[in-house]
C-alpha cells in the first residue's frame, strides 16, 4: 500500500522522534530541511510567564521556516513536520493544543497513551494524518478501529513510552492484518538499522537518540 501523501515527501525513510524536553523548532527545521520528518511533543512548548501561547509561537516559526525554504527550492521541498500529543485524560492542555495545531494545519499528528477518535477527527478536518504509538497488537488494532491512519510500533529498546516486544514479533504481528503506514521505533540509529526495519516490514524508522 502506498504511503499517505505527507510521508511520500521524504528523502530518507526516517522520522525524527519527538524527544521530551529536547525537541524544539530549530531541531525540527533542521530535520525537515534534510529530508526527514521532524517532530516535537506539544508539551515541550511550555507556557511561560507573559507568554501563554508558546505552542503557537513554535508552530509559526516552523511553518514560516518551511514555507520560506520551499519558496526558494520548489524542486527540492522540505519534508513535513509532526506534533506529538499525549491524549491521556490527564493531559489538561490537550483540547487547547489540538485547536492550535488545527489552526496551523499541522500535517502529521502523532498520538500517544490512548486512542481518541475526536483527536483523529480534528486532524482529518485539516487534512492531517494520525500516527499512533502502540506497544502490542491489541493496541494497534484498537488505534486503527478508532480512526488512526498509521502506527508507530514501539518495540524493545525504544525510549519514552517504551515497549517490551521484539521488533521482529511486533512488526510481523501487525503486518498480518494492517497494510497501512507502519513505523518502527527501538534502538535504530544508522542506515543499516533503517534498512533492517524496512526488511522486516516497516515503512519508516523512528530515530531519537542520534539527534541528542
Question: Where do the model's predicted regions map?
Answer:
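Active-site entrance/lid segments in N-terminal catalytic domains of soluble metabolic enzymes
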Residues: 1-181
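Catalytic alpha/beta core domains of metabolic enzymes, predominantly
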Residues: 166-212
